[in-house]
């Protein structure tokens, strides 16, 4: 059979490049982020020229297509190339690196300056919708997809949902970064005002999370891209704990895509399904998508592929993003920390009744080890890599567990109705949770 080595021999910032780094933080490989961050730094230099010449704005911006010479302007097809929040999406890795490592020096010297300049661009780029008062991006696209409107199939609109998600993430990351560093109060205040004027995530008449600001018909319900579900993963603007109605609407998006005739089942979209279902605490569905990826979308050498016939591909295309995004999804099945607390095996399938892991990482700066048997936790350990309060969700009856800190039993732990308890740990402290 024929295989192609690449889709178009460019770096794509509409999901593919980002997927290659979703695994790094949770898998304790944070040092592997360094090349990406150097790339973002170089990209921002070219992106300042694009911001000025294309949009007349300060700061920096980059779009979907990139190459080794730092191409940052809108390029290629309009239905995926005119995507200014691509820079925000790839820049979000800077903030996530800090969340997992708590590396304040990195945040001060590299992460926050890049995020701030990107946020500066969007503060000037956003326009107020005269009808709703919301701040809007645009014209922009929900990459590669399009909608039907008054008999037309269109790709460009104002504030597609993915843009709203990404601008919110950027502004929120900058606000939190500046608070951590104790700087830029006026800039923080500007971002807080702007973030309040962003439109909400909305549920359409079909019960799905809307992909566009207006409740329009999806022209390609079988499309491989579902960029608006960034809100579910890798971000957490939609979660079962905090936004249950939106979580149900996100699940409907996923279920409808998978059941659509001729769904475009490719390596990156199938790998995304693992993480989406893990976040929705649907273990069997997550495992099914992992199984499909391994049976259908991977070669004997373990390279993941985008199958021939999809997206105009003349033959199977090897793309690395599936190789990275799938294990990131597996990690999400085993450990989550995006809802404000640590949860062990939140999406454990029946096929994995016994197992263990060591050294997976959580937001807030910690490493977790876990052993389970007969689909039940036997022992969990959390080692702090920074001084802070951690929150842990206990599985089942709190009376079934013995808690130890550095080998000493902890008593009188305050556990809330959701079985979550807080604990203060110093760097290298070790919390143990054992089944009695």
Regions found by a protein language model. Give the residues of each.
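Short, glycine/acidic-rich hinge or "gate" loops at secondary-structure transitions
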Residues: 5, 107-109, 127-138, 183-190, ...
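Sequence context surrounding c-type heme c attachment/ligation sites in exported
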Residues: 58-69
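Short glycine/proline-rich turn/loop motifs
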Residues: 67-77
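Short Gly/Pro-enriched turn/cap motifs at secondary-structure boundaries
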Residues: 79-81, 156, 222-223, 358-361
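Acidic/histidine-rich catalytic neighborhood
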Residues: 117-177
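Non-catalytic C-terminal accessory modules of carbohydrate-active enzymes
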Residues: 124, 132, 284-436
């Amino acid at each position: 059979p024929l295989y192609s080595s690449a889709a178009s021999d460019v770096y794509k910032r509409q999901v593919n490049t980002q997927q290659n780094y979703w695994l790094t933080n949770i898998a304790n490989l944070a040092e592997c982020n360094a090349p990406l961050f150097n790339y973002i730094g170089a990209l921002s230099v070219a992106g300042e020229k694009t911001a000025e010449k294309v949009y007349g704005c300060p700061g920096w911006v980059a779009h979907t297509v990139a190459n080794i010479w730092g191409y940052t302007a809108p390029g290629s097809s309009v239905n995926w190339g005119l995507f200014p929040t691509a820079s925000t999406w790839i820049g979000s890795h800077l903030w996530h690196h800090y969340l997992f490592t708590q590396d304040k020096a990195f945040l001060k010297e590299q992460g926050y300056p890049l995020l701030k300049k990107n946020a500066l661009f969007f503060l000037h780029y956003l326009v107020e919708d005269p009808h709703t008062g919301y701040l809007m991006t645009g014209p922009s696209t929900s990459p590669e997809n399009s909608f039907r409107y008054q008999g037309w199939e269109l790709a460009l609109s104002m504030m597609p949902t993915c843009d709203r998600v990404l601008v919110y993430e950027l502004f929120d990351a900058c606000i939190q970064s500046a608070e951590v560093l104790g700087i830029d109060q006026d800039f923080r205040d500007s971002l807080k005002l702007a973030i309040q004027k962003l439109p909400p995530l909305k549920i359409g008449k079909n019960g799905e999370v809307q992909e566009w600001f207006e409740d329009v018909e999806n022209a390609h319900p079988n499309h491989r891209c579902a960029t608006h579900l960034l809100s579910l993963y890798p971000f957490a603007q939609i979660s079962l704990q905090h936004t249950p109605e939106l979580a149900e609407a996100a699940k409907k998006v996923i279920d409808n895509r998978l059941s659509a005739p001729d769904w475009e089942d490719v390596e990156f979209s199938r790998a995304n399904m693992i993480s989406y279902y893990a976040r929705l605490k649907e273990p069997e569905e997550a495992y099914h998508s992992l199984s499909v990826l391994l049976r259908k979308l991977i070669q004997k050498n373990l390279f993941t592929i985008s199958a021939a016939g999809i997206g105009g591909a003349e033959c199977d295309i090897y793309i690395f993003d599936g190789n990275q995004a799938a294990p990131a999804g597996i990690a999400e099945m085993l450990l989550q920390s995006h809802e404000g607390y640590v949860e062990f095996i939140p999406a454990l399938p029946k096929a994995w009744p016994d197992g263990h892991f060591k050294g997976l990482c959580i937001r807030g700066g910690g490493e977790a080890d876990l052993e389970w048997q007969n689909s039940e936790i036997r022992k969990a350990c959390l080692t702090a890599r920074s001084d802070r309060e951690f929150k842990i969700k206990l599985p089942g009856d709190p009376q079934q567990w013995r808690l130890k800190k550095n080998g000493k039993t902890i008593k009188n732990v305050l556990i809330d109705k959701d079985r979550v308890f807080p604990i203060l740990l110093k760097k290298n402290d070790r919390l143990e949770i054992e089944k009695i």
